[in-house]
Regions:
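Short Pro/Gly-enriched beta-strand edge/turn motifs at strand-loop
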Residues: 9-15, 115-119, 140-142
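Divalent metal-coordination and catalytic microenvironments
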Residues: 30, 44, 74, 86, ...
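Soluble or luminal CAZymes and related metallo-dependent hydrolases
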Residues: 50, 129, 189-193, 287-291
Length: 320
């Protein structure tokens, strides 16, 4: 865990960044400051299988303060999977999400919320209100601007504090790229939205970026350059993005499982809608089985996975 940036930009009083991994998004914790009526808050809560660790980290960081608010930059499972556990632990906590999916949360539509299409897990949680772009939210005594950041997710928001010029970028910008552009999987054009969001970030001129995954970074122009180059490659060859998306979905589930029998993995892939969509739209020249085998081979070749055999001789895929 990394609770402070490596750069020379100090975090504001009360703000702590808990750097997680790739299964769980980073948690940004804001302790209440003297006279802070809004109370303590956390932005993004990680994946469900890490809920116990998330609870312990937040409790330790707040040093006895009760958690008053949960804020989600978007509702992918790695950003809100800890919501339910936190709501159970802190019954009075209020939960705010980006606009666009309130009704889907209230009716718990797992297809619209992406949990069914991705084959990922997220326990049901309640919401209190919305993080409206163009407004501000007060965190540790400072007003953070809320900006719409569609692309990776059409409903995502990012937060910017103008005095410190710190940006919470979610999955709109990482030091070495950005998240899978999920609308594109379904054939919804969204690469232009990614580009527009990168332009928004550039205009904000942040001094320090807190990404959804990975460490904090200050060379924003370099990160934007990497992201735009990557985006240009995806626009020029959408097949590259489709292949990237499939491998990310597979690797992400392997992070959750850590090890899985190849037959069980095949069953999961065949039952997970996004793989069917990707295969049909981009990889139809191969059979589904051939395509899956190529995905596994790609993970093995990159060192992201290892193939072994269990006591019965059946092949097992291990996370690396």
């Amino acid at each position: 865990m990394n609770a402070s940036p490596a750069m020379h930009v100090p975090l504001p009083p009360g703000m702590t960044v808990l750097e997680r991994g790739w299964l769980s998004a980073n948690n940004i914790v804001f302790a209440a400051q003297p006279g802070d009526a809004e109370g303590a808050a956390v932005i993004d809560t990680g994946y469900v299988t890490h809920s116990a660790q998330t609870l312990a980290l937040i409790d330790s960081t707040l040093e006895g303060q009760p958690l008053a608010r949960i804020l989600n930059t978007h509702l992918h499972s790695d950003h809100c999977g800890g919501n339910a556990a936190l709501q159970q632990t802190y019954p009075q906590v209020q939960t705010f999400i980006a606009p666009g999916q309130a009704e889907q949360v209230r009716s718990w539509d797992e297809a619209a919320l992406s949990y069914a299409p991705t084959g990922q897990e997220c326990p049901r949680f309640a919401i209190t209100g919305l993080l409206q772009p163009g407004s501000t939210v007060r965190l540790s005594g400072r007003d953070w601007q809320i900006h719409a950041a569609p692309g990776h997710d059409p409903h995502s928001v990012i937060l910017f504090e103008p005095d410190s010029r710190i940006l919470i970028s979610a999955d709109a910008l990482w030091e070495n790229g950005f998240g899978v552009v999920f609308p594109e999987i379904e054939g919804i054009a969204a690469f232009d939205e990614v580009a527009a969001t990168l332009d928004v970030i550039e205009r904000l001129e942040p001094r320090l970026v807190v990404p959804g995954h990975g460490g904090l970074f200050g060379d924003v122009q370099a990160a934007l350059g990497i992201a735009r180059k990557r985006l240009a490659g995806f626009i020029q060859a959408p097949l590259r993005h489709a292949s990237y998306a499939a491998k990310v979905l597979l690797k992400y589930k392997l992070l959750e499982w850590q090890s899985i029998g190849v037959q069980e993995l095949q069953d999961w892939v065949h039952a997970t809608p996004y793989f069917g969509i990707l295969h049909q739209r981009y990889f139809g020249a191969q059979t589904a089985q051939q395509w899956l085998e190529s995905l596994i081979e790609s993970l093995l070749a990159s060192g992201a996975a290892e193939l072994r055999r269990d006591a019965t001789g059946a092949p097992v895929l291990l996370n690396q």
